[in-house]
Amino acid sequence: MGHKVNPIGMRLQVNRTWDSRWYADTKDYGNLLLEDLAIREFIKEECKQAGVARVIIERPHKKCRVTIHTARPGVIIGKKGADIETLRKKLANMTDSELHLNIVEVRKPEMDAQLVAESIAQQLERRVSFRRAMKRAVQNSMRMGALGIRVNVAGRLGGAEIARTEWYREGRVPLHTLRADIDYALAEASTPYGIIGIKVWIFKGEILEHDPQARDRKAQELQDGPAPRGAGGRR
């Protein structure tokens, strides 16, 4: 029986690209990598209530461009932009480069694996039944247009003495098909009985062209809806 590799890593440079997009000399690479990790960890803690799905870091010449994909941009921006300015200043202190901060709204959080996994984790921490949380997440994703979804939860489910793994799937999730657009995420729920791990796979369709940027464009189209006819480009 084969092991399941990370679907995102398997599809890099096929229909998905990296979340850190920069090049550095050997002597600078380690420092910039640690800086990236520190920025991501800080955003994860600082914007815990904002539903952060993805953080993209780009480094053009002597600049650092951070793009936060979030389900609740208003929580990050704050009243009259006060909170985002505070966040930008804190992030600027973590890097020597000129920092630019962008916020992108995720309009369909039910179609984002990271947000679905974190939603299940929050429900488990509130002592909601794991089966109910899994089923609700699967139904919401399928209703919003997913072609398939699988949810795994592992740990001392329901306070059981022995840890086990339960899963729920609807539709199809073709992990071996490289052209399949599969979003994957992992989250953890801290319960009185220990840590429960949640894994989510969401199948959104197939991307036929060999283009690392294709998934980002397709995700944006799913968020914005189909372009009107005659708006340019081939139909």
UniProtKB/Swiss-Prot annotation:
GO CC annotation, single: cytosolic small ribosomal subunit
Function: Binds the lower part of the 30S subunit head. Binds mRNA in the 70S ribosome, positioning it for translation.
Subunit structure: Part of the 30S ribosomal subunit. Forms a tight complex with proteins S10 and S14.
Entries under PANTHER family matching the protein: 30S/40S RIBOSOMAL PROTEIN S3, SMALL RIBOSOMAL SUBUNIT PROTEIN US3C
GO biological process, one term: translation
One GO molecular-function entry: rRNA binding
Name by which UniProt lists this protein: Small ribosomal subunit protein uS3
Chain residue ranges for the region called Disordered: 213-235
Source species of the chain: Ruegeria pomeroyi (strain ATCC 700808 / DSM 15171 / DSS-3)
Keywords: Ribonucleoprotein, Ribosomal protein, RNA-binding, rRNA-binding
Family affiliation: Belongs to the universal ribosomal protein uS3 family.
Ranges where the KH type-2 domain occurs: 39-107
